[in-house]
Curated annotation (Swiss-Prot):
Record's protein name: Neurotrimin
Propeptide cleavage-removed residue intervals: 322-344
Cell compartment(s), UniProt: Cell membrane
Main location: membrane
Signal peptide: 1-32
Statement: the UniProt record of this protein carries the keyword Membrane: yes
Gene Ontology cellular component list: axon; cell surface; excitatory synapse; extracellular space; hippocampal mossy fiber to CA3 synapse; perinuclear region of cytoplasm; postsynaptic density membrane; presynaptic active zone membrane
Similarity remark: Belongs to the immunoglobulin superfamily. IgLON family.
SMART domains membership: IG, IGc2
Amino acid sequence: MGVCGYLFLPWKCLVVVSLRLLFLVPTGVPVRSGDATFPKAMDNVTVRQGESATLRCTIDNRVTRVAWLNRSTILYAGNDKWCLDPRVVLLSNTQTQYSIEIQNVDVYDEGPYTCSVQTDNHPKTSRVHLIVQVSPKIVEISSDISINEGNNISLTCIATGRPEPTVTWRHISPKAVGFVSEDEYLEIQGITREQSGEYECSASNDVAAPVVRRVNVTVNYPPYISEAKGTGVPVGQKGTLQCEASAVPSAEFQWFKDDKRLVEGKKGVKVENRPFLSRLTFFNVSEHDYGNYTCVASNKLGHTNASIMLFGPGAVSEVNNGTSRRAGCIWLLPLLVLHLLLKF
């Protein structure tokens, strides 16, 4: 649809037959194009949506009548406007140039425009094609998603523009891994926790700056205890047991000793829970406090636990991830092996 396609006067916006009646193209005379040095319109005109397009036609003093047409619709004939569209204005009508301007160009203005002239001999025409470029726009994109580890996901990013924009997906957090897809659709099979974070969709077509939208992907997984730290503390001193767990959603922590849960508020003991960390603090350690404690981390997807020792000085030499060994066993074992070798 051209510039007059949506608003016209029935008695003015005429087809080419009407133009023949104006003697620009006399009935029965074939229209010639490109067989003379005039009229000479511009080459293809490319403008961005919303800008103004100027259509120029070079003529000379042999021209008696001149007009601009959009397909079969007359826009201007000489100084007379034949189209009601207020965006179409006459810029110049001289012996050497006949120019019009289309303001605030839109995509429906795209198409062929013809400069038609009448001389003493015969009519001539010259054609120019108006190309309208449109900045990229993302019209549809997936919402933020929460999914369990191991499942499949599909992200969608639909963009429009002229020329058709190129769509790319990029994983930008927590670790930038570069482009992951050059397509409107991003498929991830068996997603892992490392693939969580923000995914950026970019649409570009060199008409304007790329447009960017982001989707946040949350990958849920059961707790994993990454550190279970015991400690050796003399009687009467302050001691802390620490348990760290990675999980999404964040883990909830509980502490047990001899199958009994330790609760906040017990005299001399404090339980401090954070999203990925729990501390069990003894402000005045007694002999009764020594022993094995169990840290339990859980969320809706599962749970895990680790054993941690609170011990006196010299009682335990190594505590890590819920394992402990008596210090005496560490140095007695080499002596026992040496004794057996000497005996035999």
